[in-house]
């Protein structure tokens, strides 16, 4: 397809239509509770596991605005001067295909306790807590097939909540909803120069694959609970 010539400067004309842009993307989700949670150290993260092949783990944003209006000096309908943002919500739907015991504890909303005495010794028990959510730090890694760069979403605070169970390929899945929480903190020494790039909802990093572990080690020390 030949595009008409134009004086407009299209900066990505050589790459915008490449078939290599169709590369498939895989995701990894890490979560670190900010309150004591048995089995997960304060600076530790739980890997939520593998997801169904058709899972779309991407943020859904809901932004509510309220218009500020004024009388139209020429008559007719009022004119809109500005719009105030009244509320912001960012959520992820996360179906987990391979939940281990730690992930199932997160799905329960509380760590299980081991029964140490009596005929049930060695068993585990956890409370049923409908609607319970766990506050923590959330990292979502996005890797594209055949690409060196990895996109990493960093949310210093999020609520992780059970959203029941589902089904994929005749296998049960545990469903989570992660809701990002606004949270301000002072970045550590590695990121302090880039404080303006980290909003109360976090930041997105783009790093080479060989620097992913360095970034994760850096984020492990960020936004720790007081």
Predicted segments with their positions:
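Solvent-exposed edge beta-strands and adjacent loop segments
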Residues: 2-104, 156-175
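Acidic Ser/Thr/Pro-rich low-complexity disordered segments
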Residues: 3, 35-45, 141-148, 190-209
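Surface-exposed ligand/attachment interfaces on beta-rich extracellular proteins
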Residues: 70-80, 117-126, 168, 224-226
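Beta-strand secondary-structure signal
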Residues: 91-95, 137-140, 177-181
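Beta-strand elements of well-folded, non-transmembrane domains
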Residues: 96-100, 142-146, 159-161, 182-186
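Extended Gly/Ser/Thr-rich low-complexity repeat segments
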Residues: 107-116, 195-203
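Short helix-loop boundary/capping segments
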Residues: 108-159
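Mixed-charge, glycine-accented linear interaction segment located at domain edges/termini
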Residues: 154-226
């Amino acid at each position: 397809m030949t595009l008409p010539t134009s004086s407009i400067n299209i900066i990505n004309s050589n790459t915008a239509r490449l078939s290599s842009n169709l590369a498939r993307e895989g995701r990894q989700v890490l979560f670190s509770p900010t309150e004591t949670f048995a089995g997960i150290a304060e600076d530790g993260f739980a890997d939520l596991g593998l997801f169904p092949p058709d899972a779309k783990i991407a943020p859904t944003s809901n932004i509510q605005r309220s218009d500020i209006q004024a009388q139209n000096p020429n008559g007719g309908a009022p004119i809109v001067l500005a719009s105030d943002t009244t509320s912001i919500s960012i959520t992820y739907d996360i179906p987990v295909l391979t939940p281990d015991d730690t992930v199932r504890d997160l799905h329960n909303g509380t760590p299980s306790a081991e029964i140490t005495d009596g005929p049930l010794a060695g068993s585990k028990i956890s409370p049923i807590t409908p609607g319970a959510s766990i506050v923590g730090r959330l990292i979502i890694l996005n890797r594209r097939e055949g690409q060196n760069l990895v996109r990493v979403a960093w949310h210093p605070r999020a609520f992780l909540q059970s959203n029941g169970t589902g089904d994929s390929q005749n296998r049960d899945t545990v469903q989570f909803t992660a809701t990002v929480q606004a949270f301000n903190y002072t970045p550590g020494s590695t990121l302090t120069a880039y404080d303006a790039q980290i909003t109360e909802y976090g930041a997105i990093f783009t790093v080479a694959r060989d620097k992913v572990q360095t970034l994760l080690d850096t984020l492990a020390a960020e936004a720790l609970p007081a």
